[in-house]
Amino acid sequence: ATEDLPSFEDNIWAVYRQTAGLSKFPKTTLSKMLAGKMVNVGPSIGNTTHSISGNSTPKDLETAFQLMYLTFMDPRFDENEFQTGIQQIKAVLPNIQNDPDFQYQIEKEKVFYNNNPRVLALNDELLAKANLATIERVYRELFKDAAGAEVTIVGNVDLSTLKPLVEKYIGSLPKGKKATDFNKDNCISVAEGQIEKTVSLKMQTPKSTVHQLYTAKLP
């Protein structure tokens, strides 16, 4: 829903991913538990898809599966952890907003994507609307089961080792009955037609930047 979008702006979603632990384990505890292991697993929520992906060394493969399972079944939503990251954004946001390159990026995306509400610009108003409760509600709805999920595993994996891990950690996920509906209205499309726009910004060191974007439909 449109009102949920501020909570999934790239920087805010990154705050959740970077500050959240798993299950009963805070991020700091989880990091200590994973010390010495080469493994990384995390969720992704986009405009039209959601997923969990990761990577590991062969010896840490089961740890990767365990993290995947917990990311699916027992995510962690801690307001204090989340606010730590939000406060960090608030501290640097004034400088970011005063950066001409940032201002230009905003204007450019407005033109490229025809003011699509799903193309968000980080600002004070958006931060005020973002909240962890929305992230948790949407997350739990999307990852409540594995209906429609596709599993892809590539790399240096011994099949005799892999098979029991898949059966244990993926086979035990709730199957569900129906995959999440695909909503084509959530797609972000480039504006059609020939558009020209000049953006003038105050700079200490003036410069010119030109962006040209050409698009075509695939046959």
Stretch-by-stretch model annotation:
Residues 142:
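A short acidic-Thr-Gly-centered motif at the start of a beta-strand
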Residues 42-44, 77-84, 150, 176-182:
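Surface-exposed patches in mature extracellular/periplasmic domains of secreted proteins
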Residues 1-18, 22-73, 86-94, 100-127, ...:
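M16 family metallopeptidases and their MPP-like homologs
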Residues 20-21, 72-76, 93, 161, ...:
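A generic secondary-structure signal for well-formed alpha-helical elements
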Residues 112, 145, 150-218:
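An aromatic/glycine/proline-enriched structural segment found at the starts
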Residues 128-132:
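A conditional alpha-helix N-cap/helix-loop micro-motif detector
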